[in-house]
């Protein structure tokens, strides 16, 4: 009170040592620092377990909270393609519920733990089957080449009361398929769950190629199991390799697919590259799945998998009408408000600038007219297949899968510096007033709840490429009608892919310096780059009040696809419906062929690319280097789009792009493509090794670039005498090896090069002899970069996870985000519970860099399709021959 005297005192003479308090309270409330989310994992049922319809399934979880208590554990189940349905809640340990009267079906079960501070964590899903006592078969589908045999296994779902005989009987339209062993199998109460083998042989009746038969395994008192077997043409041993790998990829027990049938980026969960978690997926992964199924259709005549892959893509990655509300409000005269890109993540959020002129969108009207919808038909690039982050579907928290995004802060933002966010941002997570949006821009002064999707154009083009080969194979079999509907969707996707051919803000194409000085484009004639840029994106208000679209400005050589451009320009079965789609792709084809001639080094490797917006801000922050050469006014960039690591140092971008060139050359015989390949192929073989005898299989670990190309001239292209590439180190990347083999195979088949054919065969033989395992193909990888799990932000180097001072937010599991949360691991604490985390922890503690054997979906598919491509183009050549 005023006028009252107070005396304070302290023991300033104390000389002891104070220990840090472990807990303290304020007015009785415990203070523990930033709340740590709980941990949770399902302990019952077991993955793959089978139950009887109508029974009660016991669902249990182990849950704990390091800095508090577990308030509750909620359990959910979903069917493939369905949403999560609550099945019970437990508030005390042991966390167990009884799921009563479960109907027959396939289910995915998860547990969601909530702690005393409201933080949540979602467990990994567990897939179970509910059926009566049944005969279990694996795999459910099998392809057997003529003159060869294949196998499947049989077991029982539960113990019989006495010895039980399982009989296997064939039915269907293909008498050429027969059981040669395992027609009768005996199971006892002791060995009921030990798989026994059935062998199926295919005859040699040419009329039965593509035929199918169903082999039904039955036993008294048990439901039957059935395996569909397709008779494949006899080609070479390489197609046997293809079918073996296809079976491994499609075997649910091997973990390539989620319980909902979504292909994972990798079988393994602890993997950090473009996706920051192995059980995310990408449009790239889906494109490889479609390619895999196209080749499977060629070998077997079965097109079910091809159509199913596209249906899954459309269901999970292409936003539905409800997921992109208000696209009818889009104003093509004002596609988007300008926001500059910055050199470093710590220069964000960037300020939007409505005063910068933007061009008009020339595609919107004709696409809406052609397809009767204002919606964009394109896949988002990244999907959290298991809802690991917990955003759910449009922030409902539990829906799976969940559309997310990561990279948004300029060329120096590596995966280690990303802040994952939901594509549908309703401010439920992140910052309470802006969600995650205020990490990236200032919102023009305010923020609106919104959705935003980013497309990866190279994946879309690969989908078109795969669809073309499916069309060719199915037509040769007289089965084109089986995939007509899917081909129409691929053509539609290719039509929308044209959004990648422009400057980001539809500005003038070429010589575009100064965000204000560079004029807005007014038509295709002055704003179309004609090259596949790194992305395009679209979004809008959650309430549908406004919407926007942008392109990408920067073209990387590794994203170009002349094969897809040629297909969309010329193939009647994949022709876009829009009036100018085919012509646009014809123009792009010519531009891409010129682009590669411009970027080819003296040695043969293809240099980085070019941009219409230097630095992502039209040179406002820093102009292009003096004398920087140009391609139709686009500025040369040796590391386009991202710099950590340099974007064109990976040899895989060489093989990916040149494989498409080789397909295009094989299909058309275009001399322009041949000239580029004639120089690239000898260089690629000179920097790679493949020796089946020793198991040596290497490609360059890193490519370094010096000099620059000559400024492009259509009438007199330069020789690029000053542009050079140096290959250093070696790497055994099995996926890149498969891509290289495929490139050389197409080139050899058209050019007659025996050295290219031999090298391709050596790659394939070495892969199969030395790098196969139970899941597919892999090689040991040392991951020294995993030291960056705990790399803190440094204002000196600009590296490490940057969160602006004063910015705070939370993830669905309660993990707090702030400038103090400045490591990759701090916002992904669940990584410490990964089965392989101990390898990383040992490294962080001073041990050796961890070694992993990864099974990436794209890599397995690249290998599988390389086997089939060689079998198709050199059918009389067998392994080792």
Q: Predicted segments — roles?
A:
Residues 9-29, 122-130, 217-234:
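Terminal edge beta-strands and adjacent linker/stalk segments
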Residues 251, 315-445, 454-458, 484-837, ...:
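Extended ligand-binding clefts on enzyme/binding-domain cores
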Residues 1-33, 790-846, 851-881:
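Extracellular low-complexity, O-glycosylation-prone Ser/Thr/Pro/Gly-rich "stalks"
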Residues 9, 108-114, 199-201, 216-218:
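Extracellular recognition modules
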Residues 279-319, 455-477, 484, 490-500, ...:
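Conserved beta-strand->loop/alpha-helix structural units within folded catalytic cores of enzymes
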Residues 1, 31-132:
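Long, low-complexity serine/threonine/glycine- and acidic-rich segments characteristic of extracellular
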Residues 235-311, 478-491, 553-554, 575, ...:
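N-terminal module-boundary/linker segments of secreted carbohydrate-active enzymes
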Residues 132-235:
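Short boundary segments that mark the start of a structured unit
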């Amino acid at each position: 009170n005023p006028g009252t005297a107070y005396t304070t005192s302290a023991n300033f003479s104390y000389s002891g040592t104070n220990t840090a308090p472990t807990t303290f309270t304020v007015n009785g409330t415990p203070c523990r620092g930033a709340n740590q989310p709980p941990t949770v994992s399902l302990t019952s049922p077991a993955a793959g377990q089978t139950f009887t319809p109508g029974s009660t399934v016991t669902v249990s979880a182990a849950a704990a909270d390091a800095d508090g208590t577990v308030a509750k554990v909620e359990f959910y189940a979903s069917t493939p393609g369905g949403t999560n349905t609550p099945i019970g809640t437990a508030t005390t340990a042991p966390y167990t519920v009884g799921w009563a009267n479960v109907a027959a079906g396939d289910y995915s079960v998860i547990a969601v733990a909530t702690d005393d501070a409201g933080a949540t964590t979602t467990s990994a899903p567990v897939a179970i089957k509910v059926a009566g006592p049944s005969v279990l078969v694996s795999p459910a589908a099998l392809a057997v080449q003529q003159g060869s045999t294949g196998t499947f296994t049989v077991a029982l779902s539960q113990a019989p009361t006495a010895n039980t005989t399982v009989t296997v009987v064939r039915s269907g339209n293909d008498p050429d398929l027969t059981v040669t062993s395992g027609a009768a199998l005996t199971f006892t109460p002791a060995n009921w769950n030990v798989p026994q083998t059935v062998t199926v042989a295919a005859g040699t009746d040419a009329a039965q190629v593509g035929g199918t038969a169903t082999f039904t395994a039955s036993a008294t008192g048990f439901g039957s199991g059935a395996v569909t077997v397709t008779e494949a043409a006899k080609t070479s041993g390489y197609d046997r390799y293809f079918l073996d790998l296809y079976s491994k990829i499609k075997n649910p027990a091997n973990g390539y697919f989620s319980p909902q049938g979504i292909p994972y980026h990798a079988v393994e969960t602890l993997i950090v590259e473009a996706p920051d978690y192995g059980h995310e997926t990408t449009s790239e992964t889906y494109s490889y799945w479609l390619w895999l199924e196209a080749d499977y259709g060629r070998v077997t005549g079965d097109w079910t998998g091809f159509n199913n892959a596209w249906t899954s893509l459309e269901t999970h990655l292409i936003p539905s009408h409800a997921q992109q509300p208000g696209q009818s409000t889009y104003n093509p005269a004002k596609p988007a408000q300008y926001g500059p890109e910055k050199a470093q993540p710590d220069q964000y959020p960037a300020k939007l600038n409505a005063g910068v002129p933007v061009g008009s969108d020339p595609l919107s009207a004709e696409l809406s007219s052609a397809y009767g919808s204002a919606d964009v038909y394109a896949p988002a690039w990244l999907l959290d297949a298991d809802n690991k982050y917990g955003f759910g579907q449009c922030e409902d928290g539990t829906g799976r899968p969940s559309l997310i995004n990561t990279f948004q802060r300029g060329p120096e933002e590596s995966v280690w510096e990303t802040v994952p966010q939901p594509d549908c941002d309703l401010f439920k997570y992140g910052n309470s007033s802006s969600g995650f949006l205020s990490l990236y821009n200032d919102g023009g002064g305010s923020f609106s709840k919104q959705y935003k999707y980013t497309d990866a154009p190279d994946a879309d083009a690969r989908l078109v490429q795969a669809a073309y080969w499916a069309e060719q194979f199915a037509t040769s079999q007289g089965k084109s009608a089986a995939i007509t509907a899917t081909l129409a969707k691929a053509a539609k996707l290719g039509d929308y892919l044209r959004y990648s051919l422009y400057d980001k803000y539809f500005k003038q194409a070429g010589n575009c310096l100064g965000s204000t000085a560079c004029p807005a484009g007014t038509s295709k004639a002055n704003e179309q780059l004609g090259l596949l840029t790194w992305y395009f994106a679209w979004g809008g208000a959650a309430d549908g009040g406004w919407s926007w679209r942008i392109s990408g400005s920067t073209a990387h050589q590794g994203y170009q696809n002349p094969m897809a451009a040629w297909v969309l320009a010329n193939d009647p079965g994949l022709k876009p419906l829009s009036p100018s789609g085919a012509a646009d792709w014809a123009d792009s084809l010519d531009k891409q062929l010129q682009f590669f001639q411009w970027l080819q080094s003296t040695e043969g490797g293809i240099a980085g690319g070019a941009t219409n917006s230097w630095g992502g801000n039209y040179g406002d922050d820093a102009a292009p280097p003096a004398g920087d050469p140009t391609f139709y006014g686009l500025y040369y960039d040796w590391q386009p789009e991202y710099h950590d690591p340099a974007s064109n140092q990976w040899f895989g971008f060489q093989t990916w792009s040149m494989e498409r060139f080789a397909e295009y050359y094989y299909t058309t015989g275009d001399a322009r493509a041949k000239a580029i390949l004639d120089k690239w192929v000898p260089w690629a073989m000179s920097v790679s090794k493949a020796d089946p005898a020793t198991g040596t299989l290497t490609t360059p670990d890193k490519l370094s670039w010096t000099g620059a190309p000559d400024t492009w001239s259509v009438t007199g292209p330069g020789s690029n005498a000053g542009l050079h590439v140096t290959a250093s180190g070696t790497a055994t990347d099995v996926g890149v090896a498969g891509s290289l083999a495929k490139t050389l195979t197409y080139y050899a088949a058209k050019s007659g090069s025996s050295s290219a054919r031999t090298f391709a065969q050596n790659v394939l033989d070495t892969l199969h002899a030395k790098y196969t395992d139970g899941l597919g193909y892999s090689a040991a990888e040392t991951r020294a970069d995993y030291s960056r799990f705990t790399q803190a932000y440094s204002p000196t180097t600009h590296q490490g996870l940057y969160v602006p001072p004063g910015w705070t937010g939370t993830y669905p599991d309660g993990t707090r985000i702030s400038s103090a949360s400045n490591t990759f691991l701090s916002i992904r604490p669940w990584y410490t519970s990964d089965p392989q985390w101990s390898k990383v922890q040992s490294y962080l503690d001073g041990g050796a860099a961890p070694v992993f054997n990864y099974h990436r979906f794209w890599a397995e598919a690249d290998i599988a399709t390389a086997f089939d491509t060689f079998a198709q183009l050199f059918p009389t050549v067998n392994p080792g021959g």
